[in-house]
Amino acid sequence: MSRRCELTGIGPMVGHNVSHSNIKTKRRFLPALSPATLQSESLGQSFKLRISNAALRTLDFKGGLDTFLLGAKDEQLSPRALKIKAQVKAKAKAAAQAA
């Protein structure tokens, strides 16, 4: 399992620990990932994804999983999230044709 957010694509970053005497040693900044079960309103289904805490706040701000996925770029999303996005798009298209 990679240390990468499935929705935003945020992964580990590198930097330095800097001591008082200005000696720099390499270190990694890992994203704060947590497993989250997210509900898709249009599909009526829940999905378990490993996302960052920042992505969870963004989901709340955007109004849910469906609206976040429809506005997200495909390059950021994991293969699992891309499949969910395709299902949401297909469901929205079917609903638009029925109405």
UniProtKB/Swiss-Prot annotation:
GO terms for molecular function: structural constituent of ribosome. This is Large ribosomal subunit protein bL28. GO terms for biological process: translation. SUPFAM superfamilies: L28p-like. It comes from the Bacteria. The keyword Kinase does not apply. InterPro entries: Ribosomal_bL28, Ribosomal_bL28/bL31-like_sf, Ribosomal_bL28_bact-type, Ribosomal_bL28_sf. It comes from Caulobacter vibrioides (strain NA1000 / CB15N) (Caulobacter crescentus). Keywords: Ribonucleoprotein, Ribosomal protein. It holds the Pfam family Ribosomal_L28. HAMAP family: Ribosomal_bL28 (MF_00373). Signal peptide: none annotated.
